[in-house]
A protein has these predicted regions:
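Short helices/loops that flank or line small-molecule/ion binding pockets
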Residues: 72-86, 99-100, 132, 177-197
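C-terminal motif of bacterial Sec signal peptides marking the signal peptidase cleavage site
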Residues: 17-20
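An extracytoplasmic/periplasmic, membrane-proximal ligand-sensing/linker region
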Residues: 28-50, 235, 239-304
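Bacterial N-terminal signal peptides that target proteins for export
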Residues: 1-9
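Acidic, polar ligand-binding/catalytic clefts
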Residues: 76-133
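Bacterial signal peptide processing site
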Residues: 22-24
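Pocket-lining segment of extracytoplasmic ligand-binding domains
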Residues: 138-242
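Bilobed "Venus flytrap"/periplasmic-binding protein-like clamshell domains
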Residues: 28-29, 33-54, 58, 68, ...
Length: 304
């Protein structure tokens, strides 16, 4: 009888141990984190490593980072449940929300402001001063699903009666903000679309990617868009709610910590996060309409 009781107690202990492990959000899980390639994908992966380490340590989970070759790659990975959490640009989020079972939880801030801008840039010596001056010129968009590198600039052009296909001499899709800035600086194109964190030329893409202050002075903004709700963090609805809440807590804490702020700025030139909701991005949905871009068609064209 004593041996039987020992076996029973042993089995009960194993059962309780298994239940405790299965109840833990950390048990046997790999968290798959997606990053949009706002710049060179390898550079994004490198900049993401400190964050990956923090998530690994704080969650006690293995972290699997994924940087797509373009914005569509992250949207598609969310659609087929290959990611648990992802950093998305506003336009990518609007597309992903239509395709995937996701929820936006946080949006980024820059200098305490949860907005940023599309900026149309040229060389300071180009003679181009207005959008009308772009007719007959060469122009670089970023990724075709980029918020500031394509969607909002297209809306700006349409509002001014400019059809890039008809009115520009040549259109280039650079694939990233860094490439667009360099294309303009080096004279590969006459002008291009990128981002600025403020419309006062104090925190811009060309300041980030051009290390020589003299090169920065060679770039001038022609126009800025309306304020755009900032890029965000989304989670899969299938993710354990406890892990999801822990992620939110981690990013909010990073937003309050000077070292955390630097890490986020190195990654996507942001300073922190605040809570977000889907309705925050209604203006981006309107921008697609204003640009004459259908959501479904935008994603299908990119896939093909």
């Amino acid at each position: 009888m004593k041996n039987i009781m020992l076996h029973v107690c042993g089995l009960l202990m194993l059962v309780f141990a298994w239940l405790a492990c299965s109840d833990s959000p950390k048990a046997g899980r790999t968290l798959r984190v997606g990053f949009v390639p706002a710049e060179d994908a390898q550079q994004v992966m490198q900049n993401a490593q400190p964050l990956v380490e923090i998530l690994r340590n704080e969650l006690g989970m293995e972290i699997q980072p994924f940087v797509a070759t373009d914005y569509t790659g992250v949207v598609e990975a969310l659609r087929v449940n290959k990611l648990d959490v992802a950093f998305l640009a506003p336009a990518s989020y609007v597309l992903a929300k239509n395709e995937a079972n996701i929820k936006v939880v946080l949006k980024s801030e820059r200098k305490g402001i949860p907005f940023y801008y599309a900026a149309l840039i040229t060389r300071a010596d180009s003679g181009i001063k207005t959008l009308e001056d772009l007719r007959g010129k060469t122009f670089a968009f970023g990724d075709s699903l980029s918020t500031t590198g394509h969607v909002f600039p297209r809306k700006m052009f349409k509002e001014h009666g400019i059809d890039p296909v008809r009115d520009f001499k040549q259109i280039l899709y650079s694939g990233g903000h860094d490439a667009t800035v360099l294309a303009v600086l080096n004279g590969k194109v006459d002008a291009g679309a990128t981002y600025a964190n403020s419309p006062d030329n104090e925190d811009t893409a060309w300041m980030r990617y051009l290390k020589d202050p003299q090169d920065v002075k060679k770039i001038r903004a022609i126009a800025f868009s309306e304020p755009i709700p900032a890029d965000n963090l989304v989670i899969s609805e299938a993710l354990d709610p406890r892990v999801a809440q822990k992620l939110v807590d981690i990013f909010l804490e990073l937003s309050r910590d000077p070292k955390g702020k630097k890490m986020l700025r190195d990654l996507y030139q942001i300073d922190g996060f605040v809570t977000a909701s889907d309705k925050d991005y209604d203006s981006v949905r309107r921008a697609f309409t204003g640009a004459g871009i259908q959501l479904k068609e935008a994603l299908q064209k990119k896939k093909s």
